[in-house]
Regions:
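A short, flexible loop at the N-terminus of ABC-type nucleotide-binding domains that lies
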Residues: 1-8, 15
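H-loop/switch region of ABC-family ATPase nucleotide-binding domains
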Residues: 178-180
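Catalytic Walker B motif of ABC-type/P-loop ATPase nucleotide-binding domains
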Residues: 143-147
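The feature captures the beta-strand-to-loop junction immediately N-terminal to the Walker
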Residues: 22-24
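Conserved ABC transporter NBD signature motif
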Residues: 45-60
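Helix-to-loop junction immediately C-terminal to a conserved catalytic motif
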Residues: 37
């Protein structure tokens, strides 16, 4: 008999919402994100983006940027080559590439661009930076990130957090972010869903005490 990994009757995420997903290992967070991206097909039910079934059309791919893990990257390219490749997919001009590099200059911290190093040789933290930056290419309306703070040093975590907040303020992006870091996720997201064994246990919205509520839920 198969095991039910996800059992969510209905979950609606609104436009411009900053949505956080938290839960312990094995809760189903990554499975949910992979299902939304049509990388895993549900045995029942469906995922719709802007009212359209993700299995039935590819339109959503033009306005959703995502980074779940390093499998999204191309290991035999350098970061420079990879960004140029993704840039071409979005018809980036030289000026677009220049402004992209400028936006992420602080996060890259002179460790990513122009180093003649293959993506496969990067540290876990720098892989994360490349993936997050690439997710923003093409100015997507929706950005999905799985554990964006994992493997980053404290300075880089703060830079990622500030980047996410600034981009949302400027462009009204819809975020879907899963994280084990309760502090960062509560600073970025005004709505947080707790997932446990594939089910939504709590759906917290706009509470001043969200961090305290999460800590209370997860305490041993």
């Amino acid at each position: 008999k198969g095991v039910t990994v996800l059992n969510i009757e209905q979950l609606f995420i609104g436009q411009n919402e900053s949505f956080g997903l938290v839960g312990n290992n094995g809760a189903g967070k990554t499975t949910l994100f992979r299902t939304i991206l049509d990388l895993i097909r549900p045995t029942a039910g469906k995922v719709e983006i802007n009212g359209k079934n993700v299995q039935a059309n590819d339109e959503w791919k033009s306005y959703l940027g995502s980074f779940l893990d390093e499998g999204f990257l191309i290991p035999y390219l350098t970061p420079d080559e990879y960004f140029r490749f993704v840039g071409k997919l979005h018809n980036y001009s030289d000026a677009d590439m220049k402004s992209f590099y400028e936006k992420f200059e602080e996060l890259f911290n002179d460790e990513i661009i122009g180093k003649d190093k293959y993506i496969s040789d990067l540290s876990k933290g720098n892989l994360k930076k490349v993936g997050i930056a690439a997710a923003f290419m093409g100015n997507p309306q929706i950005i999905m990130l799985d554990e964006p703070f994992e493997n980053l040093d404290p300075t880089s975590q703060i830079r990622v957090k500030n980047l996410l907040l600034n981009e949302r303020k400027q462009r009204g992006i819809t975020y879907l972010i899963s994280s084990h870091d309760l502090n960062h996720v509560t600073e970025i997201c005004e709505r947080i869903v707790i997932l446990e064994k594939g089910q939504v246990k709590q759906d917290l919205k706009g509470s001043q005490n969200m961090l305290a509520m999460l800590e209370e839920y997860f305490k041993a």
